[in-house]
Amino acid sequence: MKLLKADNYQTWFLEEGGKAVLIDPWLSKQLQPDNRIFIQRKRNQASLLSDEDYKKVQAIIITAPFEDHLHAESIKSFPKSVKIFTSKLIKKFLYRQGIVDNIHIINAEGVDIGLMNFKALPTGFPYYPATFALLIEDSKGRRI
């Protein structure tokens, strides 16, 4: 399993068997939305992912409804065939951003994406129930 922190904050890229999953993608050079009152910061590259990495993405997982996890422009940059996995609550936020295609609910029973299994687990105070954590297991039984 290849695990890559794809930016300097929240975006994770996992690949096994030529299929990849992105978790909480923020794939922009801009580090805050335009409407933020804070000083705008930018980075030199949108992410550490190569063009080849992008092509391998089969699914996106959104773990929180906050803008640093749910960056609509990054999600919309992928083809509609890329599946989105999230919670029922976060699905509502996606709909408000105009992201309505191919959204699936992930829970503690888990879902297989490529050769990996992803299970949603509850987070602690103060984030639960708005967010979830992940237990990820590859085809060799390795977990993160």
Model-inferred region functions:
Residues 19, 80-83, 99-100:
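A short helix->loop->beta-strand "cap" motif at the edges of active sites that frequently abuts
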Residues 72-81:
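Metal-dependent catalytic neighborhoods of phosphoester/phosphodiester hydrolases
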